[in-house]
Amino acid sequence: MNDTHPTGPLVPPPIPPPPPPGYPSGRPLGELPEEREPIPNAVAAVEAILRQPRRVMYQLRQPGSGGLIAGMLFVAVLCSVVYGVVVGTFSGGVQLWAAPVKIAGGLLISALICLPSLYIFACLSGSQARLAEIFGLVAGLLALMTILLIGFAPVAWLFSQSTESLAWMGALHLIFWGIATVFGLRFLNAGFSHTQARSNAGFNTWVVIFVLVVLQMTTALRPIVGTAETLLPEEKKFFVSHWVDCLKLPKPKARD
């Protein structure tokens, strides 16, 4: 007999191995061609961080990523200054330049204060990321946060021109900052997950530290929304105590 068909048992195809740790999506960075395209300038960095965050994460791993990091920091400073001008319109006068300087400077200082702890937590978690890559991810966090704040700026300006409540304006800016921070931390978490870290415990701890540092920085650089006799405070306060004191301020009298 001429049997042209095999008689052996049918063997099912092998089950593909699970994705390696640090790649929750199952796709390593740079697998798609568009992720490997360079990001030439700050404008392209804004477009990439909003539409193609994986492209930013991949480029931060490549040699010569300093230009991208500088571009994202430039975007963060520029957007912070613009949003700070909007914040300063509530009180006017000196705050038109003081608020932008304090917001941009405070955000950068907070990031620099928290950068060493993030790198240490990354190393303890088994991450293979270089310090430059971690610094780039933090720059991306700041850029995305401030870009979102620019999106909220028209709403903040409207309320700053139509209300005299310092507590309400402070709460509104905190809400906008909180929303922007959530999205920024999502970007940072996604980038952190691609560094082969075995645990997120260190990253989650760092998030708490970063939020506390930024909140305390707003108190250390007060006043940002309102006005005071000096540009910087002469009294040390915890940010919660400062919020409580703001709520106790007398309400402004209604205009005739």
Residue ranges of each PLM-predicted region?
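N-terminal juxtamembrane cytosolic/stromal segments of multi-pass membrane proteins
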Residues: 2-69, 241-256
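Short amphipathic alpha-helical segments, especially helix-boundary/capping motifs
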Residues: 28-35, 93-98, 111-112, 133, ...
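Long, solvent-exposed, polar/charged low-complexity segments
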Residues: 38-48, 52-57, 185-256
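Selected alpha-helical membrane-embedding segments in polytopic membrane proteins
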Residues: 39-129
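Hydrophobic alpha-helical transmembrane segments and adjacent short intramembrane/lumenal linkers
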Residues: 101-105, 109, 118-228
